[in-house]
Amino acid sequence: MKAFVLGTVGTRSSLLDTLSGVRGDKNVEESYLIWGPYDIISKVRADSLPQLNSILDVMREHGVVDTNTLIVNEGGLSVEREGCGGRRKSAYVFIKMRRPSAPKLWEKYLMSIEDVLEAHELFGMWDVVVSVAEEAREDFFNRFFKKLWLLTEVNMTSTHTMFTVKE
């Protein structure tokens, strides 16, 4: 199973240490510092809920004091461009949909937006998460948001942009 974990770091002075520690876990595919109500976002892969729970424990050991875990509904919309994991993201956009809606039908449209790297239907407080390529950062409105707005079923969004951390 895939999940996106939004986390709050205990002390601001340990943001980089926490990011480095979380990224070191073999079950964490990607992790970024973000702007907004959370400090860190991590895309994780687990074989079971107990394993997901142990990933959260490791995150806590590295300084993440609070988490919000959103599990991907792999039976619904779940698509990634080839090489997605190796590309830097400028933002993750969480989408709340109007009901009734069919996010599986969004796949073709979302993947026609060049800067969309992946889109996943979620269990949790948001319905869909979309990752946007780093290349869109300079003209985010025209390259992504303007196109997203054409989906009339989008009710609300929350955009979490990334810090660029040189390693």
Where does each model-flagged region fall?
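A compositional/biophysical signature of low hydrophobicity enriched in polar/charged and small residues
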Residues: M1-E167
